[in-house]
Amino acid sequence: MSTQMTMRLTWQKRLKRILFSILIKRLFLEGGKSRVTRLSAEFVFRMHAKYPSAELFHSREKLWNTFGKHLSQQQWIGFEFGVASGDATKTFLKMPYAEKCLGWHGFDTFMGLPSEWGDLPKGAFSTDGVPPQIKSDLLKWHIGRIEDTCTTINSLSNLDKNFIVIFDFDLYTATKAAWDVVVNHLKSGDIIYFDEAYEADEDQIINEIIESRQVNLEVIGYTTMGIAFQIKS
């Protein structure tokens, strides 16, 4: 590809981001009726200021699709903290790089939120304690409170492989409990994704991780709600 064409594509991508940012900014400044819209707008501008070279994706699925190239064809295992109806699980197991997946571990009570969160009531996302019916030999459900189930991670096999870790518990306490265990096994090349980074709970966790310097994080990209990082040595 010629230098001129590369520059043109780079500029087009930049222009697309700028136009999208202007739209979100307008919604934010005009005080959109939706609380989520306002928080999402604020999140986009905060991330753009903090990570100016990071790519903004218009959907989490498009962001997830890029994980394959970051894994560089390596074998990996997945950890999903907060499963609910299993939409994310299904999506990841259909990704092109899923052929390198050695196992997918989903952690949830399947009883919904244990307390109110944002605009949602206690019990939101409940499936009455029943995990989603997904046919895959890769799946292993860990049902119960994360404080009780997360230590099973320490005895799992293939912990030397790369990780894809999805944090979608929404609440600070549960996310922190999961992080405190999984961080002991993180290594260079692992990918971590926060699905509700625009909300205060996950934002607090992310800031604490960065400030603690337990791991060296490099941004892969973000959406209007979530953000993905890769662990670097």
For each feature predicted by the language model, list its residue ranges.
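Extended, alpha-helix-rich binding/interface surfaces that flank or overlap catalytic cores
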Residues: 60-63
